[in-house]
Amino acid sequence: MKKLMTTVLATTLLTLAGCSSSTSANSSTAKDTDNATVITVGISPDYAPYESENTNGDIIGFDPDMCALFEQYLTEQEGTPYKIELKKMDFDNIVTQLQGDQIDLGISGFTYAEDRKVEWSEPYLGSSQVAVLPKGSSITSLDDLKGKKIAVQTGSTGEEAAKEIEGANVTGLKNAQDILNALSANQYDAAVVDLGVAKNYVSNGTFTMVDESLVDEQNYVIAKLGNTEVIDKINKCIETLLASDEYKTLCDKYGLTPLETK
């Protein structure tokens, strides 16, 4: 799950290897480069295992791996090469960049929020919001969160869920790393984050989490409102992904929840 609108951190472009398809997408930033149509994706690499940066500054995770597959699928489906470029930025700036035609897509752990005026793809992952706790915390249930100090990511669906907790003092922070740093310093009683992110941090033994979820969700790709052409192409890619062996492999690799497919 993730966020909604403010400042660009950096504009590092990563071209994921591989060719993919079709004529130029409906967005103003999709273009032909070396006979390949380029789709630019805004991504916030602070949300492992969805997306993060390694020591070389490369963006890694489920979503970048998915984008690499989308390049292949688009080439096969459209019959002309495509490239997907990842443009690094703050999560809460992605929607603004879409609206300004600076990027074509946002792929960064987005879960549905009615107030986000964007085009939504079909879902590609299951998700939920859970409470992460410092190791040794006396909190064992969602009821125990009442009246507690809770950190969330600004603009996220986790923020919305936390504000529903009776008497909770909810503070929005910039990104998941800031949240968990503050939590480990005992500045907050709990944090509400995506389950995939929570499991990533709980695995190192520093944190625990409440077994119950605050809300169950799904992850989506987003585009500028009205840009149905690029979303239609991505929906075909998602359909191909969900039916492939690679899908379960990626979910297992990153410890994420696959969608139930018929």
Segments predicted by a language model, with ranges:
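Ligand-binding clefts/hinges and TM-proximal coupling segments of bilobed small-molecule sensing domains
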Residues: S21, A25-S27, N35-A36, T80-Y82, ...
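Acidic, polar ligand-binding/catalytic clefts
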Residues: I84-D144, T206-S213
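Extracytoplasmic small-molecule ligand-binding "clamshell" domains
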Residues: T29-S108
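C-terminal motif of bacterial Sec signal peptides marking the signal peptidase cleavage site
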Residues: T15-G18
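Bilobed "Venus flytrap"/periplasmic-binding protein-like clamshell domains
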Residues: I59-L74, S127-L180, L195-K199
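Short helix-initiation/N-cap motifs at beta->coil->alpha
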Residues: Y82-T96, T157, T171-A185, E217
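Extended ligand-binding regions for polar small-molecule ligands
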Residues: S20, P64-Y73, K149, S156, ...
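Periplasmic-binding protein-like
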Residues: S44-P45, L125-L133, L195-E239, T257-K262
